[in-house]
Regions:
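Terminal low-complexity/charged segments
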Residues: 1-179
Length: 179
């Protein structure tokens, strides 16, 4: 997540460069108060903040996703009430194997916030259905096509592939000629 228009920030939302004239001239993200509220209420949950082309992405601890989303949805003034999308990505040559990406929208702030959680080989994370019931089919799709297991999901079964299909076609190690 780097490039010419990318700015990495620490967990507190401050530029990672640590000061100086360049940091002072850096525009403040409209979601800086949201990041500050999360880091205040959930120390250690936000691992990294990235601003890219006006969009804010938070790398978060996987075991904290549900409580972060619950807070973001319920906290007055934040109210990220809509789960726009949830997807999973399989990586082969990284220290983590999966990323689960959550895109949230706040009608109150007219803003979107992206959360990313990185998972190891086991590919397990808690379901978000208790906070966003609409996560149901998104999680089933990620389970079916990528192989991420959403623990506590009320009906985690295949949604696109046949029940007896024993592969995940969106994994990077899926055979190019099919299965």
């Amino acid at each position: 997540m780097t490039g010419p228009n990318t700015e990495k920030r620490g967990a507190d939302g401050a530029p990672a460069s640590g000061g100086g004239a360049a940091a002072a001239a850096t525009p403040i993200s409209p979601l800086a108060p949201v990041v500050a509220a999360l880091t205040e209420h959930f120390p250690g949950a936000v691992l990294e903040t990235v601003e890219y082309r006006g969009e804010t992405t938070l790398l978060v601890a996987p075991d904290r996703v549900v409580e972060l989303c619950r807070f973001l949805k319920a906290e007055p003034g934040l109210e990220f009430a809509l789960l726009v999308d949830l997807c999973a990505i399989h990586w082969m040559d990284r220290e983590y194997v999966y990323e689960v990406v959550y895109l949230l929208h706040s009608f109150v702030r007219n803003a979107r916030l992206r959360l990313k959680a990185r998972l190891g080989e086991a590919g397990r994370i808690s379901t978000l259905t208790s906070v966003h019931p609409g996560a149901d089919w998104h999680e089933r799709e990620a389970f079916d096509l990528v192989g991420v297991v959403f623990e506590g999901h009320p009906d985690l079964r295949r949604i696109l592939m046949p029940e007896d299909y024993d592969a995940n076609p969106l994994r990077k190690d899926f055979p190019m000629k099919g299965y």
